[in-house]
Design a protein with these regions (language model features):
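Transmembrane helix-loop-helix hairpins at lipid-water interfaces of multipass membrane proteins
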Residues: 1-40, 61-115, 122, 196-200, ...
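Juxtamembrane loop-to-helix connectors within ABC transporter transmembrane domains
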Residues: 54, 119, 123-124, 141-187, ...
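Loop segments that connect adjacent transmembrane helices in multi-pass transporters
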Residues: 151-156, 229-277, 373-375
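Cytosolic ends of transmembrane helices, especially the final helix of ABC transmembrane type-1 domains
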Residues: 233, 256, 280, 289, ...
Length: 628
């Protein structure tokens, strides 16, 4: 074996290292990621934002860094110790020296395993805390978004952001960053150790590195595409499940189970193919790297064995059996982190892309925000006034046009009109679920835009047609997790709204289980529970939006009795299609195409014989016909 100029050797090493650094830099800086969308944030910006969540746990990361140094030291030192043991065994057998070498190796191994274990435990705990903080902030931000903003984002997409994407980020804190750092130092440390041990054998090992760089670049391309398909397929199936499981009753009513099953099968197969493609990419890359590893081992055994048997001196360095054993271990420890780096850079890109997806949701500015000088509203009498209010969901398509009216405190006002006339929109604007474009809305003479949103809504109680009950118990749904309300007060409210009549018949009373969305209760029972939930929080203004629609006659009588009692609690605003349910209202406002066309009490509107008279006569005749 001929001797090589050390400068040539150093040049080759620098060239290989440069190739690795360029490949790694390209992997991190690539704007196209495994998530399948154009990146808008720089990696540095994402890391800075994530670092804010990691900063409270900086001391823990410093401890992990120290423990990581011990693990790196083991990877670099252990082959030297084993090589020395081999030389002791192959040469003059000295039991004392051999025992000392084995003891040192065992001690280093145990210490390394202990530090690795502690490192893993600390990282898992800290990583989960960081992700828990991030997930809570994300959920809190989603809660702050306006209704119209939430309507623009599929629920399945939000679920994916809160679950899958945050889990991808957790990998970065619990494993990726530390492993990337460790593997980089291990590669450099082993490279230096091999150079010090034998230049030419090191050069032989480095001859295989350019092939790894090429395989890594190719792997990164196909792996990114596979990950993109997998992420998109996962999001698609989550969105589909969220929508169709919520509407499964409609599917069953119209007998569309087979069609929906076929749609789901296609999406499920798409997800399966994406998983298979990702597995295939990894199953090809790993054997290729392993092939290079085996090839380098064979070259080591051949060249090293030839040098050892022929007692050849390489640049003044004699190859001993200990050197061959040491290089054998170094090659294994050298190729393993290189293989891991390629995959870890790819997963890092996926984690950064997931972080950008999460931050893209958190960067959505709520359209309903408190003014800088917004005030707290401690008490509300319930006086409401609309002054020339204009509102549109879509620019240019006005839903309300110059609406003006006044509601005195403790008055009951009903809004009637055809579908799309703007009745429910008025109630939504009062609670600031949407922002109106023109005019003013006043509560007790104060512009609602000058009141803190949380403070404003605290004085409103909303009872909607589609009552939403949370999984839990009847008690938890009435008090809404507000501790300190005694059962006696809860039952008093239930009696007030006639909900006690069915609660007392239940086996567990207030502790009766409420399934998802309250599906184990009838529509009327859910409505009575919503009345109790509203009354117990003592609102100053009560809003009923089609609260008596689709209710059986017996339950409607109970609800009507409850409404009569609730009129004494505070101001009441009602939207109803059944005109018979609002005859008691102090004022009835009739809307058409976003404008008020009639208003007055029931008798006044009948005497006018206008549109309200026509609607009432039509409904009355229909009821008479049904009774006959």
């Amino acid at each position: 074996m001929m001797h090589l100029n050390p400068l040539v050797l150093v040049g080759a090493v620098i060239g290989v290292i440069t190739a690795l650094l360029v490949a790694a830099y390209a992997a991190v800086k690539d704007k196209k990621t495994a998530m399948g969308f154009e990146r808008n944030m720089e990696d540095g910006e994402i890391m800075r934002r994530l670092a804010r969540y990691a900063r409270p746990y900086l001391s823990k990361f410093l401890i992990v860094g120290v423990l990581m140094l011990f693990s790196i030291a083991y990877d670099i030192i252990s082959p030297l110790i084993v090589g020395r043991i081999e030389e002791l065994v192959a040469g003059e057998f000295e039991l004392r020296a051999l025992f000392l070498g084995v003891s040192v190796y065992a001690g280093v191994l145990v210490f390394s395993m202990g530090s690795t274990y502690l490192q893993a435990v600390i990282l898992q705990r800290v990583g989960q805390r960081i992700i828990s903080d991030l997930r809570e902030d994300l959920f809190s931000h989603i809660e702050s978004l306006a209704h119209e903003q939430l309507n623009e984002i599929p629920v399945g997409k939000l679920v994916t952001r809160v679950t899958n994407d945050t889990n991808a980020i957790s990998m970065m804190f619990t494993n990726l960053l530390v492993q990337l750092t460790k593997n980089s130092f291990v590669i450099l440390g082993i490279l230096v150790a091999m150079l010090c041990l034998n230049y030419e054998l090191t050069l032989m090992v480095l001859c295989f590195v350019p092939f790894i760089v090429i395989f890594t670049v190719i792997f990164r391309k196909f792996s990114r595409r596979a990950n993109r398909k997998l992420k998109n397929a996962t999001t698609d199936i989550n969105t589909y499940l969220s929508e169709n499981l919520s509407g499964i009753k409609v599917t069953q009513i119209f007998g569309r189970e087979d069609e929906k099953m076929e749609d789901f099968r296609k999406k499920s197969q798409k997800l399966a193919r994406a998983n298979q493609e990702q597995i295939f990419v990894f199953s090809v890359f790993r054997p290729l790297v392993y092939m290079l590893y085996v090839s380098s081992i064979l070259c080591l055994f051949y060249l090293g064995g030839m040098g050892h048997l022929n007692n050849v001196s390489f640049l003044g360095q004699t190859i001993s059996s200990g050197t061959i054993v040491t290089f054998y271990m170094y090659i294994s420890k050298f190729f393993t982190p290189i293989q891991n780096l390629a995959e870890q850079f790819n997963w890092l890109q996926s984690a950064l892309a997931s972080a950008e997806k999460v931050f893209s949701i958190m960067d959505i500015q709520p359209r309903m925000q408190d003014a800088p000088d917004a005030i707290e509203l401690n008490e509300v009498k319930g006086e409401i006034e609309f002054r020339d209010v204009w509102f549109s969901y879509v620019p240019g398509e006005w839903v309300l046009q110059g609406v003006s009216f006044h509601v005195d405190a403790r008055q009951t006002v009903a809004f009637v009109g055809s579908t799309g006339s703007g009745k429910s929109t008025i109630l939504s604007l009062i609670c600031r679920n949407y922002e109106f474009q023109k005019g003013q809305i006043l509560i007790d003479g104060i512009d609602i835009r000058k009141i803190r949103i949380s403070s404003l809504r605290r004085h409103f109680g909303q009872m909607l047609q589609d009552v939403f009950l949370f999984s839990g118990t009847i008690r938890s749904n009435i008090v809404l997790r507000e501790e300190g309300i005694p059962d006696s007060e809860i039952m008093e409210v239930c009696r007030y709204v006639n909900a006690d009549k069915f609660i007392n018949k239940l086996d567990h009373g207030l502790d009766e289980e409420v399934r998802e969305r309250g599906n184990n209760f009838s529509a009327g029972q859910r409505q009575l529970l919503s009345f109790a939930r509203t009354i117990i929080h003592k609102p100053s203004v009560m809003i009923l939006d089609e609260a008596t629609a689709n209710i059986d006659t017996e339950t409607e009588l109970l609800i009507q009795d409850s409404l009569e009692k609730m009129r004494t609690v505070g101001t009441m605003l009602i939207v109803a299609h059944r005109l018979s349910t609002i005859q008691h209202a102090d004022n009835i406002i009739l809307l058409s195409h976003g404008e008020i066309i009639e208003q007055g009490n029931h008798q006044e509107l009948l005497h006018q014989k206008g549109r309200y008279y026509q609607l009432y006569t039509l409904q009355y005749n229909k009821m008479q016909l049904q009774e006959s």
